[in-house]
Amino acid sequence: NTEKMNELHTYICPKCGEPLHRDGGSFRCMANHVYDCARSGYVNLLLVQQMNTKLPGDNKLMVNARKNFLGKGYYNVLINAFSDCVKKYSVKNGTVLDAGCGEGIYTVSAAKKVPEMFFMGTDISKTAADAAAKKAKAEGVSNVLFSVSSVFHLPVKSGSCDMLTTLFAPWCGEEFLRVLKPNGTLIMVIPAERHLWQLKAAVYDDPYLNEPKESEPDGFTLLEKLPVSSKILLDNNEDIQNLFSMTPYYYKTSEEGHRRVEALSQLETEIAFEILIYEKN
C-alpha cells in the first residue's frame, strides 16, 4: 500500500527529527513524542514556539471565503491545469508535498487525478488543514494526509519528496530544496500580471499590474512556464466579496475601496496565472 509506505518514511517528529509512525489515531516517534490526529483526519505538527500568534495562518473568514468561492468553480481552469501538470511530472509510488495547501482544493484535485502518488498537504492554519482533511474524506480520497506546520519548518524528512507544489503560498527555498529528492520537481503557481485586473479597476483609481516573479530561484532550473487565463463573471456581491477577501488587496484597501466592493452587484474580470515548473539542481 503506497499510502502507508510513504507516510512512514516522510513525516518526521518536529521535536527530535525522528521518523513518525502511525499508531492508531496518532503519530509517534521512537522517542515517544505523540501527535494525535484530529477527528477530521489531519495531524498537528506545529510546535508552540513556531507560532507567532495564538491562531497562526488564515482565519475562519478567509478559509470559508476561499472554500465557497473555489467550490463554485470559478478557478476550475487553474485547478485542472495544475492537476494535469502534477500528472505529467508524476513518479509512480512517489511523494508530493503541497506546502501551504490552504483548504486543500488543489491538493485533493491532484490526488484524485494521480492516484499512484501519495500526497501530503500542510498549512500553518489549523482551520485550513481541518477543511482540507474534511474535503478529502467527503470525496473519498485516501492517498493524501494533511498536517499543520510552517513552510519554514517542514516536519518532513530531507530528500524524501519527488515533487513539491506551492500555490500562492510563502516561499522558503532552503526548506524546499532540503525536502526534495535530487532532480525533484517543484511546481509553483503565481498570479500573472493582469490577474483580477477589472476587480482592481473597480476598487482603485489607478490600478497597477502584478509584478512578475524572478524566473529562476536559487537551486532550481526552470523547465516549463505555462500561462493559464480566462474570464469569469461574478453575478452576486457575496462571490465578489469572497474573491476580494482572498486577495492581498483586502488588507491594503481604504474604507472607500471596501465600500466600492460592497456596491458591486456583478463583475466580469480576467483571471491569469502562471504555472512554473522547476527541477532541483
Describe these PLM feature segments.
Residues E103-P115:
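Conserved SAM-binding loop of SAM-dependent methyltransferases across substrates and taxa
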Residues G140-V151:
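Conserved SAM-binding strand-loop segment of SAM-dependent methyltransferases
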Residues N93-G102:
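Conserved class I S-adenosyl-L-methionine
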Residues L8, V228-N281:
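Conserved Class I S-adenosyl-L-methionine
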Residues S125-T127:
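Conserved SAM/SAH-binding beta-strand->alpha-helix loop
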Residues T2-L55:
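N-terminal auxiliary segments of SAM/dcSAM-dependent transferases
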Residues D58-V77:
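Class I SAM-dependent methyltransferase Rossmann-like catalytic core
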Residues G184-P191:
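Conserved beta-strand signature within the Rossmann-like core of class I S-adenosyl-L-methionine
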